[in-house]
Amino acid sequence: MTETNKNVDALEKINQMSSADYYFDSYSHFGIHEEMLKDEVRTLAYRRAIINNRKLFEGKVVLDVGCGTGILCMFAAQAGAKMVIGVDNSEMLPIAQKIITANNFDKTITLIKGKMEEVVLPVDKVDIIISEWMGYFMLYEGMLDTVLYARDKYLVPGGVILPDKASLYITAIEDQDYKEEKINYWNNVYGFDMSCIREIALKEPLVDVVQPNMIVTNDCCILTVDIMTITKDELKFRSDFKLKALRDDLIHAFVVYFDIEFSKGDKPVCFSTGPKAKYTHWKQSIMYFEDHIKIQQGEIITGTMDCAPFDKNQRDLKIKLDFNFAGELMKSSSSLEYHMR
């Protein structure tokens, strides 16, 4: 079978995939890649980190973990990499091969379909690993585990990973209107009691955009990740936090977001997915709780967050959040559990 016929068959396979197929291979759907590529904060940060650090890439062997459409592979080739290897396990890979060929990078870029843990690379070691591994809540989908596997098996001593640093933050917001729409709506649906769904909705973090004027407290870093050194076990974390009210208001939810840093090379790059930063497709993760907190400026909420993958599905996150508040107007404490899926 010719390479052209293989690519045509790949297109036909994607066209025939059902919604059930997409559930297990969601990254085969071009719409997901369109959303990520059109996220200019994300894509331009990677391009700047690679293209503007040509000295880092010239003559090097580069591995892209989860290469998708191959966009990062092509950035690396443009930056002068000697060889770029892209690995992906979705049905998008043959389409990525067409893209690579159409842009005349097929002599530099080699794409391999399969799981990173199972494929055989054409080299023993690589100089640089690039990957867009972040999910909602930063750790959702568990792809960072795969990057760490590739690091431990393939990265040369003194090699580089991009991005190489990440930080996870928590803050608290006033959000009465949206809580009514998304959570309390289920108490009365066309006259019917559907409050059992409300209980489920409260346990699932909502991925959405938080407006800056909704923020009531400062933010607090609950996890810092150095991808060069962190272990898989350290991604299961327990962290204390302290949030201070910036004004008198009500609090209806906690919000989690992350920052990413490409610190290597002559021109470091960073971006934030926080409410005060420019929109990204990751948005923010909102965790509502049953009641609300009436807080005054300067008062403190203390708490602890535990986060780990679910045993049955390592892509999902199990999040436990305990908080205590003793203000002048009210006291409140709660132990909350969430399922990010």
UniProtKB/Swiss-Prot annotation:
Substrates-to-products reaction catalysed: L-arginyl-[protein] + 2 S-adenosyl-L-methionine = N(omega),N(omega)-dimethyl-L-arginyl-[protein] + 2 S-adenosyl-L-homocysteine + 2 H(+); L-arginyl-[protein] + S-adenosyl-L-methionine = N(omega)-methyl-L-arginyl-[protein] + S-adenosyl-L-homocysteine + H(+)
Function: Arginine methyltransferase that methylates the guanidino nitrogens of arginyl residues present in proteins such as ribonucleoproteins and histones.
Encoding gene (name): prmt1
Family per similarity comment: Belongs to the class I-like SAM-binding methyltransferase superfamily. Protein arginine N-methyltransferase family.
Lineage of the species this protein comes from: Eukaryota, Amoebozoa, Evosea, Eumycetozoa, Dictyostelia
Residues annotated as the enzyme's active site: E132, E141
Protein name as annotated: Protein arginine N-methyltransferase 1
Positions contributing to S-adenosyl-L-methionine binding: H33, R42, G66, D88, E117
Subcellular locations according to the entry: Nucleus; Cytoplasm, Cytosol
